[in-house]
Amino acid sequence: SERVRLQNSGDYDEIYIMLQDGTGQAVQLTSNSDSYKYSLLWSPDSKKILWSDRLFRLRYIDIDKKQIVEVAKGKAWEIRDYTWSPDSSWVAYSQQELNSINKIYVWSLADGKTIEVTDNWYSSYSPCFSTDGKYLFFVSDRDFNPVYSRTEFNHAYLAMSRIYLVTLTAEVKSPFEPKSDEVKIGTAIETSKGEKSDIEKASTPAKTAAEKVVVKIDEAGLRDRIVDLPIEVASYSSLTSVGDRLYYIRRNMAERQSSFKYYDLGKREEKDLGQITSYVISADQKKMLVAQRREFAIIDLPAAPIKIEEKLDLSGLEMWLDRQTEWAQIFNESWRQMRDFFYAPNMHGVNWEKVRAQYE
């Protein structure tokens, strides 16, 4: 029932939370910030907010304690790719190394331990925990199929990526292990007490994501448990796990178009869902907001190509504007961005404070 917002307070934005209906007073969580913040992300238990900043830090704040904890600090660049585990006890993120390769790490909130998931040989990114906490999905560039030019003695690597998963504990079996074809004789379909038979129990849906999940990670042999999904080489993004399904957007570089798909780990098959621009799955994992160009719709989680029948009517949206306040914010934000993002810290000798005063 709460929402988070960034509000300018001094030189940098601060994090506030407030009720969704706008009633009551907003609660300020951070103060005296020293850098730009990126991509605020609530934890699944709604007790923490994770973000990264211009100073290469990845941090979260405990809502109740109002305590900021540093998860990691980038070695070569900003950390812009991160996610929570379903039990809010781990953070997975990718970080650019000094050799320009992106590596995936997981960090434990319990003891502050950092574990390397991938190595320095292949760039890996877009980590995504499975909803049951057994796997970590990610994208990695491990295929080298050069395309040669007809006019130059040169080649380029256009399609290098696949989706991979790693089983987080040694006890969890890979979903791609050979299946046993042994037939077991179950009990009768109907029992005298009306209880479910063995056959019925086997077909009962798994526990919902709302039930408690505890994520455990065995560091020993972690990289040896990495396997690739049997899908084509392309560019992948927007990984989201729901039960046995992993939703993602694939871009085929040869065809220059994107397609929306999911892979079913139980059935070991990929399904095409058509073409969309982007999507977001609701917290209860029952609904999906999809965008097709400039049109939006809320639909049930799809299992077949998407056909938008009821589009969201956004014609009634209104925005309250204070033009003078908005113009002042635009001016101040432009000044701050030049100060913080200009490649030369000394601004080429220009007195930047004086420039601000000159135009205010």
Which residue ranges define each predicted feature?
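Short coil turn/linker residues within repeat-based beta-strand modules
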Residues: G22-G24, K65-Q67, D111-K113, A170, ...
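A flexible loop/linker signature enriched in serine peptidases of the S9 family
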Residues: L6-Y16, G22, T30-K37, K47-I63, ...
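Blade-terminus and WD-like Trp-Asp/Gly-His loop motifs, strongest in beta-propeller folds
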Residues: S1-R3, S39-K48, Y82-W90, S126-Y135, ...
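Blade/loop signatures of beta-propeller domains
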Residues: Y16-M18, S203-L222
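A short helix->beta-strand "capping" segment at the edge of beta-propeller domains
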Residues: A26, V213-E232
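A short beta-strand motif characteristic of beta-propeller blades
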Residues: A26-T30, Q67-A72, K113-V117, V227-L229, ...
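Intrinsically disordered, Ser/Thr/Pro/Gly-rich linkers and terminal tails that flank
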Residues: S149, D228, S238-S241, Y248-E360
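Generic, well-ordered alpha-helical scaffold segments in large soluble proteins
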Residues: M18, V91-S94, W107, N120, ...
